[in-house]
Amino acid sequence: MTAEQCQRCNKNAVEVISRKELFCAECFRVFVMQKQRKQMMSDDYYRDIFKVMYKDKIRSAEEAEQQNKNSTILIPLSFGSSSLMMLDIVHLTLLEQKMQHQKTGFNVDVLICYRESNDELLTNIQSNIKELSTVRYSENKDNIRFHTLCLDSMFEIDKELIDQVVLHNVEFTGRQVSINESEHANLSLQTVLTSCPNRSTKEDIIDFVTKHLVKKYAYQNGQKAILWGHSMTRLADEIISCVVKGRGAQISSKLNTTNLDVNYGSRFKNLYPLKDILLTEVDAYCALFDLSKYLIKYELQDSLLVNKLKKEKHIGNQRLAKNMTINELARKYFNDIEGEYSNVIATVLRTGDKLDEPLATLGEKHCRICKSTVHDDVSKWLRDITVNVGQPLESQLERDLHEKWATSHIGLETTAYYQLRDRVWEQGDDVDLCYGCIVTMQGVKNLNVPWPKNNEQELNEVLAEYSLE
């Protein structure tokens, strides 16, 4: 039986079936490269970054050469399939520029953020960086530079730049107070995560920390744009997750690739080059072009491949729905429908792109935690729909039960929170919190979290890169 031929070149055997079209490996590579490059050339700002500049009516030859040298982008690399594929296509773009122009129009800084966890993970990261820089991308070793950053560096700054942010359990308002020496000495990402009982809250905190450090790195190092490796599928699950978490008002700003990031000095833009590419297509690319060996804590899907990677799925390893975070539930939903109903994913993303940011009735106020605009007085709204004030003890039985509760672990924690709350409300300053972060902080023990200040001094606090050797 003769193997089917690619519908594009009509020469090579089919290796991928996507969007009802048959592709050979090379035609599929061109297909996804064109979609990524379309986003990379989506407006004049990005074209000025990625194109090789020459002398013209606007710039001299020297100015054009300087612009080519100064055009630097930042790629956060998680060693998942999407960021790896995006970096691979950027590498191929640089090679093409060298062949056609004998020079390149931009340079790439790759940032790997990691948590202090286990030696095996750090060894894998170190091994991947070495092989990518010296083997796979050796032809662009002068244009692609790798950097590592520990997430703990979020809190490894001067004590004066970190405050204790506390949520009032009845008023749903926030205040902050400076942390003391002992609290600062013991502060790390792990201590913050330890105070988060549920996985969704931990995931939110890690996401806040990672994005802040990536953007802070771009702010300090003069990058023109951050290229986030989010596929169409990932962006769709981000949109749904934002709605579920009460962050729907932030969707427009999250997807904004047109404006400079005002929360970080308006020095760079955020771009999603893979927004027209499905996650299954990303995974197929990684499988076909030998990127799977660089994956860390990620398993490729092979639903689009003619030659499957595996014959059976291990159902026993799948996480139960009740143990999933909100993001994982949304991701599972889109993974399940991507094969038959990929148009649903595209519809979700198109709808998200059409959303405008709500009118800010409170003026220019930003959330103390996530930096998003606070549009309405959500604290007042929450007070109007909830009752959190306790009733006085009336009977002896109620007093006895309250005494037992007060000496329990939960009772002691609650008493400690009341003491902290009263001190902060007496000594601290008011802060603004968005609805999503009020929900997140309610998932933290004692409703408080140590957090860096939102000011220029904190942004200019130099980040220390880490060596994994």
From Swiss-Prot:
Keywords: Cytoplasm, tRNA processing
Primary location recorded for the protein, binned into one broad class: cytoplasm
GO molecular function, one term: tRNA binding
Family: Belongs to the CTU2/NCS2 family.
Its biological purpose: Plays a central role in 2-thiolation of mcm(5)S(2)U at tRNA wobble positions of tRNA(Lys), tRNA(Glu) and tRNA(Gln). May act by forming a heterodimer with NCS6 that ligates sulfur from thiocarboxylated URM1 onto the uridine of tRNAs at wobble position. Prior mcm(5) tRNA modification by the elongator complex is required for 2-thiolation. May also be involved in protein urmylation.
PANTHER family, alphabetized: CYTOPLASMIC TRNA 2-THIOLATION PROTEIN 2
Pfam families: CTU2 (PF10288)
SUPFAM superfamilies hit by this protein: Adenine nucleotide alpha hydrolases-like (SSF52402)
Organism: Candida glabrata (strain ATCC 2001 / BCRC 20586 / JCM 3761 / NBRC 0622 / NRRL Y-65 / CBS 138)
GO cellular component, one term: cytosol
Subcellular location: Cytoplasm
Keyword Protease in record: no
Pathway given in the UniProt record: tRNA modification; 5-methoxycarbonylmethyl-2-thiouridine-tRNA biosynthesis
HAMAP family: CTU2 (MF_03054)
Annotated InterPro entries: CTU2 (IPR019407), Rossmann-like_a/b/a_fold (IPR014729)
An example Gene Ontology biological process: tRNA wobble position uridine thiolation
Protein name: Cytoplasmic tRNA 2-thiolation protein 2
